[in-house]
């Protein structure tokens, strides 16, 4: 019988073969091919990472950091390649959420039944 880790590796390969993953790959390639979208996407990622790193240390971001993040997010969301990427990311996240519910169902049952 395969181990849990073997099954996880199989699931990772299945994820890569899924339509959602392929759509994400295509959408991301379109963002990278569009200079304006790629630049805006990069700026957003940098601003978001900066805030996440502060929060992971238990620190609050400064108002100007939050403003920069919001500004870059608004700029990015106005660009079609990034809008399209966001939709595809949401679809993939929905699928992963459903998979997570299936995987963790025994844990939920354990806690609810005891």
From Swiss-Prot:
Gene3D superfamilies: YheA/YmcA-like
Protein name: UPF0342 protein OEOE_0901
Intrachain disulfide bonds: none
InterPro entries linked to this entry: Com_YlbF (IPR010368), YheA/YmcA-like_dom_sf (IPR023378)
Similarity remark: Belongs to the UPF0342 family.
A Pfam family the protein falls into: Com_YlbF
